[in-house]
Amino acid sequence: FKQKTAYEMCGRDWSSDVCSSDLTNLTKLAKENRLEPMIGRSNELEEMITVLARRFKANVLMVGDPGVGKTAIIEGLAQEVAKNNVPEFLKNHEVWSLEIGALLAGSKYRGEFEEKFRTVIGALEAKKNCILFIDEAHTMKGAGAGNNSSLDFANMLKPAITKGNLKVVASTTWEEFYESFEKDRALMQIGRAHV
């Protein structure tokens, strides 16, 4: 049995179960007019694009009260990318949304979660020009960790976000931000945007 690479597992069309069940291509949905138009959030979108323009640590954490439209902003970015109405450095990018719950739910044991995680992140890094959106980012803390292990989703994601191999946009509430993110200096490297 030959171990496949992440890119081979997902393939060029990303049709494999590993990637299609856990990732949603928001840019593709935008091209198919299946996303609601973003209204009145142009300042927040510009702020996000400014952070994504950085060469390293080009990551955004949107913090705001529940229901203020954090997900709508990333969908607005996907629509702008689909229309090619973005700065040169974001052209030909794709915005992908990751379902942490789906990633966890399909894992029967701890090692399988790590394998799925590495496959998904590895495929995004290999594909290049990808922006990963993680909604309810506070769920990263502790997700997939074993009883005697501190290795969870957040710790596995840190190398990708600190090296700049992957652009990440995450969202959370103020309450969860103070509880989860302020205590973790490595996760605080994600640039914060108020929504």
Predicted regions and their residues:
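Short glycine-rich substrate-engagement loop in P-loop NTPases that contacts/grips substrate
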Residues: I100-L124
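Short regulatory helix/loop adjacent to the ATP-binding pocket of P-loop NTPases
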Residues: A145-N147, E175-Q189
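A short beta-strand-to-loop transition that corresponds to the Sensor-1 phosphate-sensing loop
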Residues: E136-A137, A170-E176
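Single conserved hydrophobic/aromatic residue that forms the stacking wall/gate
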Residues: F1-W14, V18, A193-H194
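N-terminal pre-P-loop "Q-motif" helix
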Residues: E36-M48
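Loop/turn-to-beta-strand initiation segments
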Residues: A58, E94, K127-L132, K163-V169
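Walker A/P-loop
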Residues: T50-K57, L61-L90
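AAA+/P-loop NTPase substrate/partner-engagement loops
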Residues: K83-Y109
